[in-house]
Amino acid sequence: PPLGVEGVAAADPNQWVPASDRPPFDWAGESVRRMGTVIHRWLRIICEDGLEKWPSHRVDAFTERISRHLKSAGISQDQLAEGVAQVKSALYQTLEDPTGRWILSGHTAGACEYGLSGSADGRIIHVVIDRTFIDDNGVRWIIDYKSSAHRGGSVEDFLDREKERYQEQMAGYARIMRGMENRPIRLMLYYPQLKNYREWGADEVSGLSYKV
């Protein structure tokens, strides 16, 4: 881990043929959050196992385990088959995506679900960063996985809106990290289901420049 930053243990957080008699899956609210928790968990498992052990077809061997994780997360029985298909699809997509593989590969000071504490507006806050590491150019990356659904319209417009939505949250992560180390920081929102992302430099946000 980077100097002065202490990681904390995180809590346990594409082949789909829909059956005509299967109830529609509720992607709103809690269902999305619960599915996202399981996707995060499996991305951490893959990363910590080592990417070289995870060709995309290996995901099929863990169907039952993914199902158990979804049940534990609160996905109901009638939504389970669809939930399993969506989690597996997200993992397939990530493992087939060059950016996804780069995120999950080994890096300097790499960590998953990395806990940090800092202060904001006079309050102590605690955050968990989905994935962070230092790349070959000495840049610290702070990456947040997102399971947001994209329904119609331009994917690029959707990603631009998502960046605007989460920019302040990501800036908060960068502020805490900046208090621990002085190096360039880049921020990324990564969308496994879309094989797509948005990234930007933390120095684009006022007050987050680093000292050369």
Regions found by a protein language model. Give the residues of each.
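A short beta-strand motif that forms part of the nucleic acid-binding face
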Residues: 145-149, 191-193, 204
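A short local loop/turn or secondary-structure capping micro-motif enriched for an aromatic residue
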Residues: 121, 150-153, 207-208
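Short beta-strand-loop-alpha-helix junction that forms the active-site gateway
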Residues: 145-162
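Glycine-rich, phosphate-binding/catalytic loops in enzymes
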Residues: 55, 159-161, 206
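Short, electropositive alpha-helical surface patch
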Residues: 196-212
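Pre-DFG segment of protein kinase catalytic domains
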Residues: 142
